[in-house]
Amino acid sequence: MSKAISRRDFLKVTGAVGAAGLLAACGGSSNSTAASSTASSAASVEAVGGLSSDPVTLTMSWWGGESRHNAYQDAIKAFSAEHSNITVNPTFAAWSGWEDTMSTKFAGGVAEDVCQINWNWLYNYSANGQTFLDLNSVTDYLDLTQWDDAKLAACNVANAQQCVPVSMTGRIFFWNMTTFNKAGITEVPSTLDDLMAAGKAFQEKLGDDYYPLHLGAYDRMILMVFYLESKYGKDWADPTTSTLNYTADEIAEGIDFIKSLVDGHVIMSLPAYYGSNGDNAAHQSNEWITGKIAGIFEWDSSATKYASALDDDNKAGFTVGEEIKFGDYNGGFSKVSMGLAITKTCKNPAEAAMLINFLLNEDKGASIMGSECGVPASKAGLAAAQAAGAVKELVAEANGKVMDFVSCQLDPLFEANDLKATGTGTYQEVFDSLDYDGSTGADLVDTLLDGMEAVGYTVG
């Protein structure tokens, strides 16, 4: 405890500059400051040199699952068919360990020319504009007008348009109603009371190894924040300063909310899940596949991944749920799901910009990519994907429900790797301790606050 008090007394760290303009504050109005900043930065950027007449080789990297890998590779082949002098060499893998790999590349100046990035990487690896090119310098080759100002503003850091958003995303509940029906429940949960009643019904009617919902450690943190925002109507932290908006007592209440879900048999304890599955994602678990876990709180873009993972006895029950209103306010946030950026070490930025434009804006590329990276944020890309029937209905339904409901802003430090990393992050430490040690919110709040301060949050 003395260490925590010492840090709280003496380490008052200013937060990173945030993404003003991404969303309105909980229940508030949108901020045009970042959009105007984006416009002013665009006016002062010198354009890059033109296209090369010689053969060009580009490199590109991304993370994802098999269907995303296939979509990118097919789109790259189509791009090279139209631009025969440009060869694109891809590097891709699953998410696990990917950020560590890319952070090393960014630090060494050896990252690929075009990179799929997480939004917070702009702050983690290019807070001063040192890593990614200002895309205002390639507007002859990349049509930035296809994105709304607010979406572009979310990716404008250090007065530079460092990436374009591929899609916007947020969390929503997916349910397996086949299992719910077996427990005598015919409607998707829409309130906290519904969740608690489902936990009791599952245990009594189906047995101790059936649960209405599963939450991993990071999922628990996101739902905890969703709950607090729903109750108190304020962002988790100020998006421009990363100053925490919640008191220690309020955060302890949020942690105890998660504990109540474990105690009420709504969610499986983490020790029980790890015992069966290790660090495997929920959609890979036997419990999800066979319907013993009947709900998940996930990114909207994951809808088809979770639906397709169900076995034949359960597939028909997959349902995109509704956001649950835990209080008087609409909690939850949306964010840039991922962006495409050009590294400053790229020797052919004009061609790299053409590749991004092809993938996200042009009919051929956007129709191949479809919704593999979420519902397209580009207006032209969305129209092309829809015309080709390439936007998956489940993903579109989930995304629409998220965007219609959530009202809070995300700050750029929330997803810091030291906080959310599987196995080693602060969020994992907090929620593992909750289950393994029988701790309470009051016991664990300092652990969470210490971890947040360590990555740059200002904690009162």
Give each language-model segment a name:
Residues 199-200, 243-276, 324:
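Glycine-centered hinge/linker elements that transmit conformational signals in sensory
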